A protein has these predicted regions:
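Metallo-beta-lactamase
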Residues: 1-116, 120-132, 148-224, 242-248, 272-288
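Active-site metal-binding loops of divalent metal-dependent hydrolases
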Residues: 27-28, 86-89, 129, 159-160, ...
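Short, P/G- and charge-enriched loop/turn segments at secondary-structure junctions
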Residues: 57-63, 142-143, 222-223
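Cap/insert and terminal regions of metallo-dependent hydrolase folds
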Residues: 98-105, 109, 232, 236-324
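Metal-dependent catalytic neighborhoods of phosphoester/phosphodiester hydrolases
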Residues: 134-144, 303-304
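Active-site glycine- and acidic-residue-rich loops that bind
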Residues: 134-136, 221-233
């Protein structure tokens, strides 16, 4: 990701999954992400080979650039209002990532356009504790970071929280999870715990959990998919026989469905991230679940299918999903 797009308004896109309504809340869009920077092991010939299988809204063959974004997913289900990941947030100092540094976006207006105020959110579910997934947990008020979703229970990995707290000097470093994650290539950004999670915990709004697949609310569960971060999770929603998977940073672009071996520059433990990606791709292809991405452009939602020995990604639009 190399350049922030304009902050022009985007209409909310909504999908039906059983009795649940899932709505995208956009934050940022890029149309000129450099694939060589995002995927250090990718060569131009390989991109050209798969470019014909990527849709025009995700890859521009004339420029060789990728389209990406950041967004949240708003879920209305079983009488609850649920927000899955909270994007980057405004005013957050992120000097090591200029495209995320001290943003000023109309995210809250887009949430309002979807018919929800922060006070109406019951649950905030965090797939992992990275800057572009937890930022709107808090807002700057009187020079202090205050929780935005003041009625919501914020649910996240205990291991992720301890790891992030240690990074910011609030706790000793935790033991790694039992699985061997391999060598850490990319440390997480500092200060994310300080400005985006600790204020929530201090306000009594946090709930740290084990990522073990157990249901945490009606039809909602966290499933282990480590590697991109130390205890990264895929969140699954089951409703009336249908499934939605919120895959977060299992993939950063549809290209990785075709090339699951590609590591992103942002993955902390790339070998484990690849193993998790291959596992999620295989399970998603078998289940037929509707997958909701964290950084894909276009609708952000799609299905994974088998493609010879590998996989393919097909975007799903709300009209195509209307019968669900």
């Amino acid at each position: 990701m190399t350049q922030q797009s304009s902050n022009s308004a985007e209409p909310p896109l909504s999908f039906r999954v059983g009795d649940a309504l899932v709505t995208r809340i956009p934050e940022l869009r890029w149309t000129n992400a450099d694939p060589a920077r995002l995927y250090p092991d990718l060569d131009a010939a390989a991109l050209g080979a798969y470019g014909s299988q990527l849709s025009a809204g995700s890859y521009n063959p004339d420029t060789g650039k990728l389209a990406q974004g950041t967004h949240s997913w708003l879920v209305r289900h079983a009488g609850r209002v649920i927000l899955i990941d909270t994007a980057t947030g405004n005013d957050k100092p992120r000097p090591s990532a200029p495209m995320l540094d001290r943003l000023d976006t109309p995210y809250l207006s887009r949430l309002a356009a979807a018919g929800v105020t922060p006070e109406q959110v019951d649950l905030v579910l965090l797939t992992h504790i990275h800057a572009d997934h937890v930022g709107w947990n808090t807002v700057l008020q009187d020079n202090t970071w205050q929780p935005l979703f003041t009625r919501a229970r914020h649910v996240y990995s205990e291991t992720e929280a301890r790891y992030a707290a240690a990074l910011d000097g609030f706790a000793p470093a935790p033991d790694l999870p039992p699985a061997d994650l391999g060598r850490a290539d990319h440390p997480p950004m500092p200060q994310v715990y300080t400005d985006s999670l600790k204020p929530v915990i201090d306000a009594g709004l946090g709930q740290a959990i084990a990522i073990d697949g157990k249901e945490i609310a009606d039809g909602l569960s966290f499933h282990p998919a480590p590697g991109h971060s130390i205890d990264h999770a895929v969140i699954r929603l089951r409703s009336r026989g249908e499934e939605a998977w919120f895959i977060a940073d299992i993939m950063h672009h549809p290209l990785q469905a075709y090339r699951p071996d590609l590591r992103s520059v942002y993955c902390e433990f790339p070998k484990t991230a690849e193993q998790s990606r291959r596992g999620v791709l295989a399970q998603a292809a078998e289940s037929g679940a509707l997958c909701f991405s964290a950084h894909f452009a276009e609708s952000g939602a799609g299905r994974i299918t088998r493609n010879g020995p590998g996989f393919a990604w097909k975007f799903v639009n709300p009209k195509e999903n209307s019968a669900s």
